[in-house]
């Protein structure tokens, strides 16, 4: 894999991680705010979706770090 492709993947995964983290933050705030008229099932669904988005953010951040290390190894 060439350096430009790895650099592009590193940046893409970093952007995905930040986007997923932002979405999960808004979902968490929406689930935690009181008196929104949400049922227990809806809150549970929002917390589950929040966990999925956080897991995706951690996965993307990890992939970004992997490509960063590969780029550093390729430079040596």
From Swiss-Prot:
* Protein's UniProt keywords contain Transmembrane helix: yes
InterPro entries xrefs: YrhC-like
State the compartments where it is located: Cell membrane
The record's annotation in Pfam families points to: YrhC
> Topology in the membrane?
Multi-pass membrane protein
Q: What is its main location?
A: membrane
Q: Which residues cross the membrane?
A: 16-33, 45-61
Q: Establish whether keyword Transmembrane helix is in the entry.
A: yes
Q: Which GO terms describe its cellular component?
A: plasma membrane
- Record's keyword terms, sorted: Cell membrane, Membrane, Transmembrane, Transmembrane helix
Top-level taxon of the source organism: Bacteria
What protein name does the entry list?
Answer: Uncharacterized protein YrhC
Per the UniProt record, the source organism is Bacillus subtilis (strain 168)
């Amino acid at each position: 894999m060439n350096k430009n492709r790895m650099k592009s993947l590193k940046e893409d995964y970093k952007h995905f991680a930040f986007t997923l983290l932002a979405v999960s933050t808004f979902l968490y705030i929406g689930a935690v705010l009181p008196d929104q008229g949400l049922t227990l099932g809806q809150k549970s669904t929002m917390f589950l979706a929040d966990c999925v988005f956080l897991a995706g953010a951690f996965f993307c951040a990890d992939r970004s770090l992997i490509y960063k290390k590969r780029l550093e190894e390729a430079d040596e």
